[in-house]
Every structure is written in C-alpha cells, then in structure tokens.
C-alpha cells in the first residue's frame, strides 16, 4: 500500500516524519496518519512525494513495482556518476 511505500522511502532517505512534513509543508501528524493507514495523501501530496523521492506516482501507488529513478534536474556530471555506480554494482553482482 502507499502507506508502506511512503514509510520505506522516508526511512531510505533518513527523514524523520517531521523532516518529511516540513519538506511537504504539512503537519507531522499527516505523515503519521499516512504511515498508520488512518488516511491517504491527497493527489497533490502523492505528486510531491514522487518528486521528492524521485520515483513515479505509479510506484508510490503500487500500480507498478518497478522503481525508477528520475534524473530530472541532475547535471550531466551527476548522471555520469550515477551510471558509473550502477555499472560498478552490476559488476559486483556478477563476480
């Protein structure tokens, strides 16, 4: 469920609930409610979460389990570094 994805991504980014709430300009209790499955985020918050975590809205909503990473806003140098890291991890898995 989206609630689990929000918590997982928040933890992967090492954000507290308060950190995430501040980034979204909402109350910490809203993040708590999402993660506890007592409410679901509005579409504008789903879009904001997807942008913040650089994933698709489909991934957040569990329509698609493929986790894609948005490179929007990254410089060519940053993209090159990411590609080098991915290649390194691919080689490590195969050796």
Could you say what each language-model-derived stretch is?
Residues 35, 45, 61-64:
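DNA major-groove recognition helix of helix-turn-helix
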Residues 1-12:
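A short, Lys/Arg-rich alpha-helix, primarily the initiator
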Residues 14-36, 48:
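Short alpha-helical DNA-recognition segment
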Residues 12, 52-55, 88-91:
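Conserved amphipathic alpha-helical interaction elements at protein-protein interfaces in regulatory
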Residues 24-25, 42-59:
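DNA major-groove recognition helix of helix-turn-helix/homeodomain DNA-binding modules
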Residues 64-95:
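Interfacial/linker helices and their anchor residues that mediate assembly or domain coupling
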């Amino acid at each position: 469920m989206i609630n689990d994805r929000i918590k997982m991504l928040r933890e992967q980014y090492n954000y507290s609930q308060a950190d995430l709430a501040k980034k979204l300009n909402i109350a910490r209790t809203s993040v708590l409610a999402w993660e506890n499955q007592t409410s679901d985020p509005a579409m504008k918050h789903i879009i904001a979460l997807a942008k913040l975590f650089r994933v698709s809205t489909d991934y957040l909503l569990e329509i698609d389990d493929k986790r894609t990473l948005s490179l929007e806003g990254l410089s060519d140098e940053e993209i090159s570094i990411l590609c080098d890291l991915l290649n390194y991890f691919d080689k490590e898995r195969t050796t």
